[in-house]
């Protein structure tokens, strides 16, 4: 199952990202600092990996406003993890089949692979088997890979703070 999005152009300065670790559960939350709302559904898109991992997209006003890693997949540390240099700015809108402004919840089962740099400050989640065609910057430290059909194929979290106690 795939998550297809629509891209809205963004000309403003990219939003800052607020990272928060839950030390009891190791849940990492990355939220856009801006609170601009638009019309559309609010809720979550839950991406369930075949290994039991969970990544959740926070949707407010139809737009992706954050990422939560609820259950971590095995993270493969790479000696060199290259962040895409050729990105475009945009807002990602999750189309809603429900009523305008309603609460939406979708669950998608997919292959979920996590890679990081050696310091674990850059983390890349790959979704499904498709290939990405472009990368959209939705916030200062969140990038999203899309394929040619605007299906989400990856999520980048940049400048991730260390887990408390691992510093």
Regions found by a protein language model. Name each.
Residues 1-42, 46, 55-57, 66-123, ...:
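Intrinsic disorder/low-complexity detector
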Residues 48-50, 107, 136-139:
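Short solvent-exposed loop/turn micro-motifs enriched in small/polar/acidic residues
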Residues 53-68, 123-125, 144, 152-157:
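Short, structured motif recognition centered on aromatic/hydrophobic residues
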Residues 56-60, 115-117, 136-137, 145-147:
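Well-ordered beta-strand positions
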Residues 63, 73-75, 131-133, 161:
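Residues that cap or initiate secondary-structure elements
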Residues 125-131:
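Extended, Lys/Arg-enriched charged tracts that mediate electrostatic binding to polyanionic substrates
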Residues 132-167:
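Mixed-charge, glycine-accented linear interaction segment located at domain edges/termini
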């Amino acid at each position: 199952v795939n998550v297809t999005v629509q891209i809205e152009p963004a000309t403003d300065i990219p939003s800052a990202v607020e990272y928060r670790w839950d030390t009891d559960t190791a849940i990492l939350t990355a939220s856009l600092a801006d609170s601009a709302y638009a019309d559309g559904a609010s809720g979550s898109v839950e991406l369930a990996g075949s290994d039991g991992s969970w990544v959740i997209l926070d949707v407010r006003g139809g737009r992706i406003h954050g990422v939560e890693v609820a259950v971590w997949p095995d993270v493969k540390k790479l000696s060199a993890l290259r962040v895409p240099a050729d990105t475009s700015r945009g807002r990602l809108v999750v189309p809603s089949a429900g009523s305008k402004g309603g609460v939406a919840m979708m669950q998608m089962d997919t292959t979920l692979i996590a890679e990081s740099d050696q310091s674990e400050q850059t983390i890349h989640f790959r979704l499904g088997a498709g290939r990405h065609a472009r990368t959209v910057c939705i916030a200062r430290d969140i990038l999203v890979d899309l394929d040619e059909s605007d299906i989400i194929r990856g999520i980048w979290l940049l400048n991730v703070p260390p887990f408390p106690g691992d510093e």
